[in-house]
């Protein structure tokens, strides 16, 4: 790897780490009035369209199954989600939001929309769309690099 490419990789990773921290801070602020955390909002959001097994949520979110399991159990304990039987797998139950869970996510909607407008107005809607496309493409490429780290 050339020094220039190594620098590009470092700058990209550090930039994404910084963005991750910034987006998590925003998500915490948006979720708090609804009685959620960013992580709980993220897991609930993953199952709004359809119930999913914990492993499926983890794959979609790019985090460990154990982390999702812990959050899912908390959501169920608080009445925001429930486990349902999974016809495809007897032991891997499906996580689904309850009406209370859907209501909590819905309470985030107006503040989320207002922040989305502020961000698009400040950054530029076309620029934001381009950034999203680029980040999605980068994620696909990284997924295909198997293993992610190789010997020189």
Model-derived features with residue positions:
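Short, locally clustered residues in the helix-turn-helix/winged-helix DNA-binding domain
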Residues: 45-49, 109, 136
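Alpha-helical linker/hinge and terminal dimerization helices associated
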Residues: 19, 23-26, 30, 61, ...
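Basic amphipathic alpha-helical segments that dock to polyanions
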Residues: 44, 57, 72-78
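N-terminal helix-turn-helix DNA-binding core of bacterial DNA-binding proteins
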Residues: 25-67, 150-152
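C-terminal regulatory/oligomerization modules of transcriptional regulators
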Residues: 1-4, 126-152
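Pre-recognition alpha-helix immediately N-terminal to the DNA-recognition helix
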Residues: 11, 15, 22, 26, ...
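Charged, amphipathic alpha-helical coiled-coil/dimerization segments
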Residues: 24, 73-133
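N-terminal leader segment of winged-helix/HTH proteins
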Residues: 1-34, 126, 152
């Amino acid at each position: 790897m050339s020094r220039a490419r190594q620098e590009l990789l470092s700058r990209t990773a550090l930039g994404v780490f910084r963005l991750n921290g910034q987006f998590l801070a925003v998500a915490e602020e948006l979720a708090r009035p609804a009685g959620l955390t960013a992580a709980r909002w993220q897991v609930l959001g993953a199952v709004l369209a359809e119930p999913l097994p914990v492993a499926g949520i983890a794959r979609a979110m790019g985090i460990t199954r154990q982390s999702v399991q812990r959050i899912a159990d908390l959501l169920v304990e608080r009445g925001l989600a429930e486990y349902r039987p999974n016809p495809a797998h007897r032991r891997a139950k499906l996580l689904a939001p309850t009406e209370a869970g859907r209501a909590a996510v819905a309470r985030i909607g107006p503040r989320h929309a207002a922040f989305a407008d502020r961000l698009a107005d400040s950054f530029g809607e076309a620029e934001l769309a381009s950034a999203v496309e680029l980040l999605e493409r980068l994620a696909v490429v990284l997924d295909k690099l198997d293993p992610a780290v190789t010997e020189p």
